[in-house]
Amino acid sequence: MKNISILGSTGSIGTQTLDVVRNHPEKFKIVALSASGNIDAIENQIHEFHPEIVAVFHREKAEILSARIGKKVKVVSGIEGLIEVATLDSADIVVTSVVGSIGLIPTVEAIRCGKTIALANKETLVVAGELIKKEAEKHKVQIIPVDSEHSAIFQCLQGEDIHNISRIILTASGGAFRNWEKQDIQHAKAQDALKHPTWNMGSKVTIDSASLMNKGLEVMEARWLFNVELDKIDVIVHPQSIVHSMVEYNDFSIIAQIGAPDMRGPIQYALSYPNRINSSIERLDFRKISALTFMAPDTDKFPCLSLAYESLKIGKTMPCVLNGANEVLVEYFLEDRIGFYDIPKFIEKAMSAHKPWVYTDIEELLEVDRWVRNWIKEQIE
């Protein structure tokens, strides 16, 4: 039996993690949950899974939840509450499925407590990849990726020598605007971008998918997860989302991980690793697949991918700037306050306005994150 803490249990990855646990009660037990402010959803989760502790980020919502459930479970709030969930003594695995850089500090604290990390919060490695890897090595902690692409690569690397990698090939669905003309994308609204063709994801990730920023962030994540240089990481658009990613070795043979586009697959693999257990997801039937297609990403239509590569090449604090700017701009786009192409436009401006430096601790990164968020708000408001 593995004890699971979930950071972000009411979001897309969190609820699908609970579905995996629900299907395997003999293998997994929930000991801690957290949410931003959806107390109705987390109250239902409390009644079903009986955790020891629950964190609600917004203090007022936490107080309301505590009044509702009485002394059934300890309720905490704020970043301190997320840290309590991440470092709970009884937890074996911490699923980091919160969205954005808010996941950074709890993830670091979980690593320092020796917890296995099932990483779904890609921003943690985007912002502080080098620091996270050092902490994981220092505390002998394993980071198991939950993103479908990185889970695929992780699986393709099993039993292989990482030094024999020729390149990593990340697949991208192409997002909601894959077949749109650039002039039409200019006038797109949030509801258009949220119509993802293959995956069921949260709103922020779905917008990032439409801009290809999600793939850019995944390139940065792969750089640190697998210790592979940037020039060995390629992106290819694969609309069917059946080949989840591939690894090419120095003999030019390619190993791919293939399966139905269902996030419960990589989630379950991360929880059960190194074992494989029976799954309830759809079984892939090759007789029903007419074609698997691949194409190069269009970085003219989707400049966010190039910006992500550029920020990683520059390194230092620049990835933190790119990430923080993108998070704020996606919020503005979801609120219909800016256009779709304002996202890369203002990210590029923020990168130009920033003079990157070599950071030594998390507080410096948080300072950069605060700076870029305020800078973006000043430019737009």
Curated annotation (Swiss-Prot):
Gene3D superfamilies: 1.10.1740.10, NAD(P)-binding Rossmann-like Domain (3.40.50.720)
Listed EC numbers: 1.1.1.267
Entry keyword set: Isoprene biosynthesis, Manganese, Metal-binding, NADP, Oxidoreductase
Pathway: Isoprenoid biosynthesis; isopentenyl diphosphate biosynthesis via DXP pathway; isopentenyl diphosphate from 1-deoxy-D-xylulose 5-phosphate: step 1/6
Residues that bind 1-deoxy-D-xylulose 5-phosphate: K122, S148, E149, S173, H196, S209, N214, K215, E218
MF terms (GO), sorted A to Z: 1-deoxy-D-xylulose-5-phosphate reductoisomerase activity; manganese ion binding; NADPH binding
Highest taxon listed in the record's lineage: Bacteria
Binding locations of Mn(2+): D147, E149, E218
Catalytic activity: 2-C-methyl-D-erythritol 4-phosphate + NADP(+) = 1-deoxy-D-xylulose 5-phosphate + NADPH + H(+)
Keyword Lipid metabolism: no
Enzyme class: oxidoreductase
Gene Ontology terms: biological process: isopentenyl diphosphate biosynthetic process, methylerythritol 4-phosphate pathway involved in terpenoid biosynthetic process
Listed InterPro entries: DXP_reductoisomerase, DXP_reductoisomerase_C, DXP_reductoisomerase_N, DXPR_C, DXPR_C_sf, NAD(P)-bd_dom_sf
Co-factor(s): Mg(2+); Mn(2+)
Coiled coil: none
Intrachain disulfide bonds: none
Residues annotated as binding NADPH: T10, G11, S12, I13, N38, N121, E123, G202
Family stated for the protein in its record: Belongs to the DXR family.
Function description: Catalyzes the NADPH-dependent rearrangement and reduction of 1-deoxy-D-xylulose-5-phosphate (DXP) to 2-C-methyl-D-erythritol 4-phosphate (MEP).
UniProt protein name: 1-deoxy-D-xylulose 5-phosphate reductoisomerase
